[in-house]
């Protein structure tokens, strides 16, 4: 019995070309053919599937709201959690160094692998099969799309707050530390003419920027920190 059969059962798709699934599970640190190209494709396919569902289920929603709702469905945290739920982390092929540093628990690696699998299913069986698999993974989240309330991210709220007062837009200074496979992003957020300066630290630049923006809003003490999401945009 192929050791990937259990994973394919969880994914809801039996691959015709098993090599596609193997590549989708292979991180670049392993030194073999890796999943970066499949991830690139899967990112677009996944975004299209969710965007299409939102378009059908939320006919009254505006473009900006649709974009924010899609982002909440396909952000790194969401994809990493789904990757673990499907057991993808158990099958990842990593280099020795990446394994020792906890790569199978790393959010970005988990999210990238899920996107790569989406790309692999798309190549292996086409869009409709891929759509069926993706919507099945999301389960009740798909049914909730018609009720999903769009939240603006911290960067958008900060920009709107500043524009409403005719103030300069925020500046985000980024410092990157660590090895290429385990980078840490430190972002400082400030606005010319205002005394505040805040910092956000995370393993992705986008999330670090969101954290810094949220903290900046909280310093403004204008009620804008309530209900803000720091998710990637």
Swiss-Prot record:
Q: Which residues bind Mg(2+)?
A: 39, 112, 115
The kind of enzyme this is, by top-level EC class, is: hydrolase
Residue ranges of every copy of the RNase III domain listed in the record: 4-126
Secreted listed as a keyword = no
**Chief location:** cytoplasm
Cellular component, GO, one term = cytoplasm
Q: Does the keyword section mention tRNA processing? A: yes
- What SMART domains would the database entry show? DSRM (SM00358), RIBOc (SM00535)
Query: What is the recorded function of this protein according to its Swiss-Prot or TrEMBL entry?
Result: Digests double-stranded RNA. Involved in the processing of primary rRNA transcript to yield the immediate precursors to the large and small rRNAs (23S and 16S). Processes some mRNAs, and tRNAs when they are encoded in the rRNA operon. Processes pre-crRNA and tracrRNA of type II CRISPR loci if present in the organism.
Family listed: Belongs to the ribonuclease III family.
Give the record's subunit note: Homodimer.
**Protein name according to UniProt:** Ribonuclease 3
Instruction: Please name the source species.
Output: Coxiella burnetii (strain CbuK_Q154) (Coxiella burnetii (strain Q154))
Q: Which gene encodes it?
A: rnc
